[in-house]
From Swiss-Prot:
Location within or outside the cell: Cytoplasm
Reaction catalysed by this enzyme: Hydrolyzes single-stranded DNA or mismatched double-stranded DNA and polynucleotides, releasing free uracil
Classification via Gene3D superfamilies: Uracil-DNA glycosylase-like domain
Designated name of the protein: Uracil-DNA glycosylase
Annotated gene: ung
Superkingdom of origin organism: Bacteria
UniProt source species: Pediococcus pentosaceus (strain ATCC 25745 / CCUG 21536 / LMG 10740 / 183-1w)
Gene Ontology annotations for the cellular component aspect, listed alphabetically: cytoplasm
Length: 230
């Protein structure tokens, strides 16, 4: 079978790729990409896994659905491509980062530097129709990404899971809390950020947890200028 992901995630998820539900999802996506405007483009669907190999994951920031605007999504939760306006939820993440660690917001939303350090920016659904939020829910992505979450939870080296909002917190049942760290709060969207996201200090809490595990903390400071890397 041809490789779908070009690192150790391929072995972790190989069993899922061989399931009937994944074959059905694949056929659904072939039709969707042929007939609809789908985000991200098909070459970036698995970008979160490509940039953050299974063995390198230290932190997971769970999202729900890719951004559904033009040129936004590139396969990572909350992140947008260079040159695209920073979405409101990410603006609020930057505000909390400044409040928590004194890191001033950058003028882009490209989070590759986080991914490169072991922050898996994973959406539970990996594709979406243009302008139609949640349009690809219930077609099989959730089963695949739930398997990824469980595999990380069971891995020998523990992980910090950052869960923002109800949809992310619903994944707690997949995580062994006796060995992994869960940091949870309201979602950073403008609708809910003031209900417990602001002031939750997820970035410093994550680094404290990593240091307690003997891991190097994340450098959350993003570069001021970026170019897209394939």
């Amino acid at each position: 079978m041809k490789k779908i992901i070009h690192n150790d995630w391929q072995d972790v998820l190989q069993g899922e790729f061989e399931q009937a539900y994944y074959a059905k999802l694949h056929e659904f996506l072939k039709h969707e990409y042929a007939t609809q405007n789908i985000h991200p483009d098909m070459y970036h669907i698995f970008q979160a896994f490509e940039w953050t190999p299974f063995s390198k994951v230290k932190v997971v920031i769970l999202g729900q659905d890719p951004y559904h605007g033009q040129n936004q999504a590139h396969g990572l939760s909350f992140s947008v491509q260079p040159g695209v306006q920073v979405p409101p939820s990410l603006q609020n993440i930057y505000k909390e980062l400044q409040s928590d660690l004194g890191i001033a917001p950058v003028q882009h939303g490209y989070l590759k530097k986080w991914a490169d350090q072991g922050v898996l920016l994973l959406n539970s659904v990996l594709t979406v129709r243009d302008g139609q939020a949640y349009s690809h829910q219930g077609h099989g992505w959730e089963r695949l990404t739930d398997t990824a979450i469980q595999a990380l939870s069971e891995r020998e080296q523990p992980v910090v899971f950052i869960l923002w909002g109800k949809a992310a917190r619903d994944k707690i049942k997949l995580i062994d809390q006796s060995r992994n760290i869960i940091i949870q709060s309201a979602h950073p969207s403008p609708l809910s950020a003031y209900r417990g996201f602001f002031g939750s200090k997820p970035f410093s809490k994550t680094n404290e947890a990593l240091e307690a595990m003997g891991e190097t903390p994340i450098d959350w400071q993003l570069p001021t200028e970026v170019l897209e890397e394939k």
